[in-house]
Amino acid sequence: MFHLKRELSQGCALALICLVSLQMQQPAQAEVSSAQGTPLSNLYDNLLQREYAGPVVFPNHQVERKAQRSPSLRLRFGRSDPDMLNSIVEKRWFGDVNQKPIRSPSLRLRFGRRDPSLPQMRRTAYDDLLERELTLNSQQQQQQLGTEPDSDLGADYDGLYERVVRKPQRLRWGRSVPQFEANNADNEQIERSQWYNSLLNSDKMRRMLVALQQQYEIPENVASYANDEDTDTDLNNDTSEFQREVRKPMRLRWGRSTGKAPSEQKHTPEETSSIPPKTQN
């Protein structure tokens, strides 16, 4: 019995030694395989350069998350990695102009102006026509200045620069601003003013106004006994303007009134002295 127990203890010790040796050999084999193949650092760098969905999980169960979400390869505070910039192929247009700082393809500034430092993206037929017209105008100006040095430059500039007639202004929902011809409107206004002046200066209108004035001023009994000849002579002779209308009695606040006409309110010192004092009964 004692001999069997001793053999069992030796077998267990040997088994433990074998397990320990196997566990010690596994990391060495992993290091050898990693040294023969690509290292994990290069794999991690490659993963950082690409867009991947999840985090990187290492064999030691450590989780490494991507520090930069965007593929711009930027470090903190706006700095870029100098090692990664060499592998990037920059997209360029028309020479050495970089595409990245240009936001819009039209290269336009505010208020329709273009950046003079950058060339135009596309050349149209309108640009060619404009350039040709400018060259022709400059040649004509040089010829005119060479032949007639004392000529009037104002007439030349008036002929060269003419205002372009714009299209009629359009409003929203298909409406348009009504455009009237200026000549017709001016002629109508002139004719209307001439007609008004002729009416004011005519004898018929003046007689009608004088008749209205006399109708409201002369009492009815006097107007009934007046002869037709007298009225005609009065109309011909009376060229005075309308008299100022007599104002109504002065009104005070809160509905009160003086009860007197404006002519009766103020009396001169002579009138006040001539008025006898009231006697008390």
From Swiss-Prot:
Region (Disordered): 137-156, 226-281
PTM annotation (Phenylalanine amide): residues: 77, 111
Family per similarity comment: Belongs to the NPY family.
Compositionally biased intervals (Polar residues): 271-281
Biological-process GO terms, alphabetical: adult feeding behavior; circadian rhythm; determination of adult lifespan; larval feeding behavior; multicellular organism growth; neuropeptide signaling pathway; positive regulation of cell size; positive regulation of ERK1 and ERK2 cascade
Name of the protein in question: Short neuropeptide F
Lineage, uppermost ranks: Eukaryota, Metazoa, Ecdysozoa, Arthropoda, Hexapoda
Propeptide: 31-64, 115-165, 176-246, 257-281
Disulfide bond residue pairs: none
Subcellular location, record wording: Secreted
First and last residue of the signal peptide: 1-30
A GO CC term assigned to this protein in UniProt: neuronal cell body
